[in-house]
Amino acid sequence: MLTEDDKQLIQHVWETVLEHQEDFGAEALERMFTVYPSTKTYFPHFDLHHGSEQIRHHGKKVVGALGDAVRHIDDLSATLSELSNLHAYNLRVDPVNFKLLSHCFQVVLGAHLGREYTPQVQVAYDKFLAAVSAVLAEKYR
């Protein structure tokens, strides 16, 4: 459960993320494809090379969806309902992949935020991304 302090930390850090939306999203996807190559199977039509426009575009969409979640942090289920439907019913993405991408996104945050990525920020983002992953996996039940 996110505390008010967690929410404030998430929103504060998100201001930095917004300045690098496409870069952070693309880097998180590239890290996921590198570390968890099985995730590439969901993107057979993508050019998966470093810096490809398709990865950059999708990375921006991913971070945009996370931004919606940040803005509506107290109503994640309603905010992410359509995205959950898409991934569960149309794309049929294994929900474990949400956790993998969440981990990669946290690595990107840590790599780019430096000292601003404190233990408190890490815990807040870990809880937030776990909540997002859980909501995205709701339709699989």
UniProtKB/Swiss-Prot annotation:
Keyword Metal-binding annotated: yes
One Gene Ontology biological process: hydrogen peroxide catabolic process
Family matches, as Pfam families: Globin
Keywords: Heme, Iron, Metal-binding, Oxygen transport, Transport
Domain Globin: 1-141
Residues binding heme b, per UniProt: H58, H87
Gene3D superfamilies: Globins
InterPro entries, per database record: Globin (IPR000971), Globin-like_sf (IPR009050), Globin/Proto (IPR012292), Hemoglobin_a-typ (IPR002338), Hemoglobin_oxygen_transport (IPR050056)
Protein family membership: Belongs to the globin family.
Function: Involved in oxygen transport from the lung to the various peripheral tissues.
Record-linked PANTHER family: HEMOGLOBIN FAMILY MEMBER, HEMOGLOBIN SUBUNIT ZETA
Protein name as it appears in the record: Hemoglobin subunit alpha-D
Gene: HBAD
